[in-house]
Curated annotation (Swiss-Prot):
It comes from Theileria annulata. It catalyses: [protein]-peptidylproline (omega=180) = [protein]-peptidylproline (omega=0). Its main location: secreted. It is found in: Secreted; Host cytoplasm; Host nucleus. Peptidyl-prolyl cis/trans isomerase (PPIase) that acts as a key virulence factor by promoting host leukocyte transformation. Binds to and isomerizes specific phosphorylated Ser/Thr-Pro (pSer/Thr-Pro) motifs in a subset of proteins, resulting in conformational changes in the proteins. Promotes host leukocyte transformation by binding to phosphorylated host FBXW7, disrupting dimerization and promoting FBXW7 autoubiquitination and subsequent degradation. Degradation of host FBXW7, leads to stabilization of JUN, which promotes cell transformation. Residues 34-142 form the PpiC domain. GO terms for molecular function: peptidyl-prolyl cis-trans isomerase activity. The keyword Cytoplasm does not apply. This is Buparvaquone-resistant peptidyl-prolyl cis-trans isomerase NIMA-interacting 1.
C-alpha cells in the first residue's frame, strides 16, 4: 500500500517536481548563531541591546573577537559556551536568543556572512567574518 502511494507520487510529474524542489529548498538553508561586535565604522554603530553608541575601533573589535574565538576553540562544550558568550557580549538583538538567527537561505544575509555560514559544518565555528555590520563569529547549528 505504501509502495503504491510512493509510486503514485513519483509518477505524477507535478508532485515529483514539488517533492524534489521542497527537498532542495530545505537543504539550501542553514541555521546559525552569531556573536557580533560593532565598531565605529560599522553600518549602524549602536549596540542593539543597550541602545548605546559603539566607541571601539575596528582593530579593537577584531582583537576582542580573536580572544573570544580562542576561548571558544578551547571549550569542551562549544554549543553551550557560544550561546552564553553571544548572550553576554553580542551587540545584535539576537543576543537575547543566544545569538540564534534561525534558518536562512543564501539570499538573506550579507555576502561574507552567507559564504562563511554555508561553508561551516554543523557544530563548527567560523574564523572572524567582517561585514558592514561589524565583526562576527558564526556557529552553525543545523
Amino acid at each position: 500500500m505504501i509502495r503504491n502511494f510512493l509510486n503514485f507520487l513519483w509518477n505524477n510529474t507535478s508532485l515529483r517536481f514539488l517533492i524534489i524542489n521542497t527537498i532542495i529548498f530545505a537543504m539550501d538553508k542553514v541555521r546559525c548563531a552569531h556573536l557580533l561586535l560593532k565598531h565605529t565604522g560599522s553600518r549602524n554603530p549602536v549596540n542593539r541591546n543597550t541602545g548605546m553608541p559603539v566607541t571601539r575601533t575596528k582593530e579593537e573589535a577584531v582583537s576582542e573577537m580573536k580572544g573570544y574565538l580562542e576561548m571558544l576553540r578551547k571549550s569542551d562544550n562549544l554549543d553551550q559556551e557560544f550561546r552564553r558568550l553571544a548572550t553576554a557580549k553580542s551587540e545584535c538583538s539576537s543576543a537575547r536568543k543566544g545569538g540564534d538567527l534561525g534558518f536562512f537561505d543564501r539570499n538573506t544575509m550579507q555576502k561574507p556572512f552567507t559564504e562563511a555560514s554555508f561553508k561551516l559544518e554543523v557544530n563548527e565555528i567560523s574564523d572572524l567574518v567582517e561585514t558592514d555590520s561589524g565583526v562576527h563569529l558564526i556557529y552553525r547549528i543545523a
